[in-house]
Swiss-Prot record:
Listed name of the protein: Pre-small/secreted glycoprotein
Family membership noted in the UniProt record: Belongs to the filoviruses glycoprotein family.
Disulfide bond residue pairs: 109-136, 122-148
Residue positions the entry lists as glycosylated: 41, 205, 229, 239, 258, 269
């Protein structure tokens, strides 16, 4: 045992030399910020990428591209009963609308027409220029009633409702939307030698019908007590045949359910309403919840901070900032151009004028 122990034990002098070498490597790494391990040309740390993009490459806000990102990528439940629980009514909060340049193709979109018990509408009509989200695989069209305890329907998690290149904080009546957020991509300025070859331009067939390139399937629902704690959702197969939805499900499951009822002659054969209930043994999660389910584990949704904060400096937060909501119409007219609708909020980004001086690029804000 003793000799075996001596074999495993590092001699005192060698231990001192080894520990000294380790400390030298650690201090050396911290001093010059070189990652431990084999350093090659492909070794690039996240902080270096951040500095490369943010410090050296952003010379003009023309390099910023605003994009709409769907919440489906975070793995949220997309069935109607689950989705409607993320929306709620509030009063006294003005709606905000911002534009974005590009977006994703959505797997699930929604279209709501909800009335109060007295027959009045719960949701406002969309402002001029607001059109439905153009790329949806499934459109969940919901009609029904609810208490609607408030003037406008907002997202409880602070997300946007994405329409056609416009994102709003509220839901508009009869207008297809996807849930999402608006983010900025920073595009590096292209070098001149990138454009030596003539770029290939593919012919684009422009059309006013933005949904003509993509197969969209509309699924209809009927909902009662929309916006309440206990809402009831029915999947509409035809005008007289419905299915009670009592647990989360995928749109692919509803498509199969619709085909099964029709193929087996399970539709209502009278003018009365026939409502089916799901067998508890049936698995309603056929297909996919969303096309990027692996992002479910991402924490802190809507709280991501990027280097864009270095360039976009909002107005300092003061107690008077709330008073901006009560500004008179005359003051608002000086804030926005006359051609800008009152519901459209421009994103206040600073433009830069850049020039080369002594071989260095120098930028200053445009006046």
């Amino acid at each position: 045992m003793g000799s075996g122990y001596q074999l495993l034990q590092l001699p005192r002098e060698r231990f001192r030399k080894t520990s000294f070498l380790v400390w030298v490597i650690i201090l050396f790494q911290r001093a010059i910020s070189m990652p431990l391990g084999i350093v090659t040309n492909s070794t690039l740390k996240a902080t270096e990428i951040d500095q490369l993009v943010c410090r050296d490459k952003l010379s003009s806000t023309s390099q910023l591209k605003s994009v709409g990102l769907n919440l489906e990528g975070n793995g949220i439940a997309t069935d109607v009963p689950s989705a409607t629980k993320r929306w709620g009514f509030r009063s006294g909060v003005p709606p905000k609308v911002v534009s974005y340049e590009a977006g994703e193709w959505a797997e699930n979109c929604y279209n709501l027409e909800i009335k109060k018990s007295d027959g009045s509408e719960c949701l406002p009509l969309p402002p001029d220029g607001v059109r439905g989200f153009p790329r949806c695989r499934y459109v969940h069209k919901v009609q029904g009633t609810g208490p609607c305890p408030g003037d406008l329907a907002f997202h409880k998690n602070g997300a946007f409702f994405l329409y056609d290149r416009l994102a709003s904080t509220v839901i508009y009546r009869g207008t297809t939307f996807a849930e999402g957020v608006v983010a900025f991509l920073i595009l590096s300025e292209p070098k001149k030698h990138f454009w030596k070859a003539t770029p290939a331009h593919e012919p684009v067939n422009t059309t006013d019908d933005s949904t003509s390139y993509y197969m969209t399937l509309t699924l209809s629902y009927e909902m009662s007590n929309f916006g309440g704690n206990e809402s009831n959702t029915l999947f509409k197969v035809d005008n007289h045949t419905y299915v009670q939805l009592d647990r989360p499900h995928t749109p692919q499951f509803l498509v199969q359910l619709n085909e099964t009822l029709r193929r087996n002659n399970r539709l209502s054969n009278s003018t009365g309403r026939l409502t089916w209930t799901l067998d508890p043994k049936i698995e309603p999660d056929v297909g996919e919840w969303a096309f990027w389910e692996t992002k479910k584990t991402f924490p802190n949704n809507f709280m991501e901070k990027t280097c864009i904060s270095k360039f976009y400096q909002p107005t300092p937060t003061t107690p008077q900032i709330r008073a901006r909501r009560e500004l008179s119409k005359e003051k608002l007219a000086t804030t926005h151009p006359p051609t800008t609708p009152s519901w459209f909020q421009r994103i206040p980004l600073q433009w830069f004028q850049c020039s080369l001086q002594d071989g260095q690029r120098k930028c200053r804000p445009k006046v």
